[in-house]
UniProtKB/Swiss-Prot annotation:
Localization terms from the record: Cytoplasm
Protein name: Cysteine synthase
Pathway: Amino-acid biosynthesis; L-cysteine biosynthesis; L-cysteine from L-serine: step 2/2
Assembly information from the UniProt record: Homodimer.
First-listed, main subcellular location of the protein, grouped into a coarse class: cytoplasm
Catalytic activity: O-acetyl-L-serine + hydrogen sulfide = L-cysteine + acetate
Pfam families per the UniProt record, alphabetical: PALP
PROSITE patterns reported for this sequence: CYS_SYNTHASE
Keywords: Amino-acid biosynthesis, Cysteine biosynthesis, Cytoplasm, Pyridoxal phosphate, Transferase
Class of the enzyme per the UniProt entry, highest EC level: transferase
Amino acid sequence: MASRIGIANDVTELIGNTPLVYLNSVAEGCVGRVAAKLEMMEPCSSVKDRIGFSMISDAEKKGLIKPGESVLIEPTSGNTGVGLAFTAAAKGYKLIITMPASMSIERRIILLAFGVELVLTDPAKGMKGAIAKAEEILAKTPNGYMLQQFENPANPKIHYETTGPEIWKGTEGKIDGFISGIGTGGTITGAGKYLKEQNPNVKLYGVEPVESAILSGGKPGPHKIQGIGAGFIPNVLETNLIDEVVQVSSDESIDMARLLAREEGLLVGISSGAAAAAAIKLAKRPENAGKLFVAVFPSFGERYLSTVLFDATRKEAESMTFEA
């Protein structure tokens, strides 16, 4: 990762140093301030660009993989696959991705464009199904190596080394609460640990779907917030760091994501809507008056054009005709 001064040596040096911006219109009625960490401004438009690079680089440094020889394998709901795909392309690796068939068509197209071998799995089996298929492929692939985002320490490590320090610097150390949707748990674990080391009073808030509230003691279930709520507690997630888990429904998340586009000019994915909805709930609590909350917006909305997020907009666009 570089400071973006001059010309980068390759695309991986463009990762990180994403901006922070206050939410204004959608945060009316809040007694605290809410800022968003715009991870959709990464080279391939999601926070997973960070871990795609970090997991491959870490394995290289340990001598576990070599370009042109090793075959990388990973189960993903989409964005980690894209983060791995552009790094693998830049470094010269073959990559096999397993992904639930319920993920957006945009993700399939992007992965294929990067030269990925894509294997779709039963959507009813969720991420567990994708993981099982990846393990099956690994067992029969010579020189195969699974990066294991849900277990790989290089996942939270990159957030400890980059995301956390960026937020601390960007807020001039004035952050009071950090909000992150929980998929692998890498972002909240890594960035959260760094922020708490700087100031133990910083509160960490995890966001999960109401429909699959595992962290809150509920059962896994189907939901529409792609990228979070995997249906199990990942090994890299340090739950002891989290001060509170905020539940947000799929409908709340979708409505907020649409509102962010119309009222803030921020075209974001559904999980960003979930993070914003959770942050606004927190910033409306009387005890949080004057406090600053930072929410991670993980991905760009253009990756979700075929999903429920843009159903009405897509139908309107498709029904339009030219004027004489």
